[in-house]
C-alpha cells in the first residue's frame, strides 16, 4: 500500500508550536501518525494554550525553520521575555518589542506613515506618543524608607467591585489594522479579559471597524460580564443600542471613546464617528443603570462636563497618541483634571504606563487606576491569558516595591508628596 504523505502544521496563534503528523508529539501525548482529525478536541497547544483549530498547514521549508526555533526554546522557562520574543515575530515590521516602549523617533513604529497604517505607533510624527512617555518620566519618585514596616495594601473598590490592584488593561482593538492581522480579534479580546480576571482586575476592550461593532461587548458577556467594553463615538442611535446590549449582558460598566472621533480607521472604512455634545452624553448616561465612562478627557473643561452629565468615571487618555499629533502628555494634564474631579468619581488614566513604578507615578498625579495598553496587547497576541497574567504579576511586584520604598502603606497615602518633578523640584 502506498504511504500517504503526512502533513505538517504550525499553531497560527503563537506562531511557535509545530506539529508533524508522522512523528507525533510525545509532550502532548500524540502518537506517531496521529492526523489532525484524530487529535482530541480537548488538546491544547503547549505554548499558548489554544485548541487544535489553530493548527494550520505549513510548507516543509517553513516547518524546518520553525521546528528548529521551537526545539531550541521548548524547555525554556515561559517568562515574559519568552512571550516578548513571540510577539516580536508576530509583529514583524511594525513593532520591535523593545525593552523600553517610548515612541522615540528611532523606533520601528515611529515617524510619518503618509497614509499607511500607523501600526503600534502614533498619529502624524508620533509626537504625542513620545510626549506621553517623556511627561511621565519628568517625575521622579522620592525614596522614603524610615518607617515601620507594613506590606502595602493595593486593593480598591471601583464600580462596586473589589480589584486586587489599581491597574487595568486599557481599551484596545484592531488586530487587522494595527497588529499584522496576526490572530482573530475575538481571541485577542479573550486574552486581555481572561488575563485581567485571573489577576484580580479588569480588562477593557474597544471596538473596531473591520469586525462587528458588538464583538467586544459580546466577548465581555462570554467572560461572565467581567470586563468593560468601550465603544467608538458612533451614531447616538447605535450607541444606545450597544449600551442596552451591555446592560443585558450584565457587564461591569461601559464607556465611550470620545477621542475616537478622530479615528482614521473608521473614517477610511466609511463608518462615521462623531464628536459628542453635552446633551448626547446626558442621553447616554440616562439611558442605563450601568456605570458609564467617558474616555479621551485631556482638559479641565471636559472633566467638568463629565462630572455635570453624571458619568461614573473620567478616563484621561489621548488614545496612546494615536489620534492627535502634537498634543500634551498624560502626566502634564492629569493633576489639573484630578483637581477638577475632586474625588467625586474615579479618575482612570493611561499613557506610557509600562511598570509598577509608572503606575505609582500615575496614581500620585491624581488617578485612581492606571491602565496599560501596548504591553498587554503584545502579551495577548503572543499567548493570550497566560502571558497577560504574567505581565500583571510583573507590574504588581514592581508596584509593591515602589510603595514600600516611598513610604506608602496604602493607596490613600499615594499623593504628589512622593514625587519630585516639574512643579515640585
Question: Could you describe each region identified by the protein language model?
Answer:
Residues 27-42:
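Short linker/helix segments within small regulatory modules
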Residues 194, 222, 234-349, 356-374, ...:
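Alpha/beta enzyme core
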Residues 65-163, 423-425:
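An N-cap/entry alpha-helix motif that binds or orients negatively charged groups
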Residues 5-7, 41-42:
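Short metal-coordination and nucleic-acid-contact micro-motifs, chiefly zinc-binding Cys/His arrays
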Residues 20-21, 54-57:
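Short, non-ligating residues that shape and space the ligands of small metal-coordination modules
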Residues 10, 18, 44:
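The −1 position to Zn-ligating cysteines in a subset of zinc-ribbon hairpins
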Residues 13, 46-47:
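Short, cysteine/histidine-rich loop/knuckle motifs that typically chelate Zn2+
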Residues 117, 126-214:
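N-terminal functional module of multi-domain proteins
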